Amino acid sequence: RIIAQCRWLLPLSLMLVGTISPDIGLGATVVSLAPVSAVHETGVTISIKSREFSPNTVSLIMGQKTRLVIKNLDTELHAFLPVGLMTDSHLNISGNGAPQFAKDGLVRVLLPTSGQTEIVFIPSRSGTFPYFCDLPGHVMRGTIVVHKNEAMIE
């Protein structure tokens, strides 16, 4: 009977999530309806070592959820400044980096020695966005290219 009542759900993409929540009760299962595109996530890691970003060019897809991980493998403090990429965007930032914001969004993240920051966001526009470290004497630069779709990535 339940299957017959839920037949209309079959064409949808579903994600089942098991939880233990004091609000709902132990062992409760929460069903979350989410389209596949919202669940799919691209992961990109930018490492900092010997005062260089690697890779120094990163490709992303507009509208696709992205988990950008920045790892400082150096023995000194560094900064990550994504110019124009994350303005007016919803961000989820975690890790031991220190994010700095302005009224239009993320300005930079300071990364301590062996530090790491994860930024989850959805690129909202295509284009080429530089990123760099603005600490004195650090001439580290890179580029994030946001493509309109996967077919545009070489």
Put a short name on every predicted segment.
Residues 26-32, 52, 103-154:
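Extracellular/periplasmic metallocenter environments
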Residues 37-65:
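N-terminal edge beta-strand
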Residues 86-97:
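Short aromatic-acidic-glycine turn motif
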Residues 9-21:
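Bacterial N-terminal signal peptides
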Residues 56-81, 116-125, 130:
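Beta-strand cores of secreted/periplasmic/IMS beta-sandwich domains, seen most often
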Residues 74-76, 86-88, 137:
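Solvent-exposed loop/turn segments at secondary-structure junctions
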Residues 1-10:
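Bacterial N-terminal signal peptides that target proteins for export
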Residues 82-86, 148:
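Residue-level signal for short segments within beta-strands and strand-turn junctions
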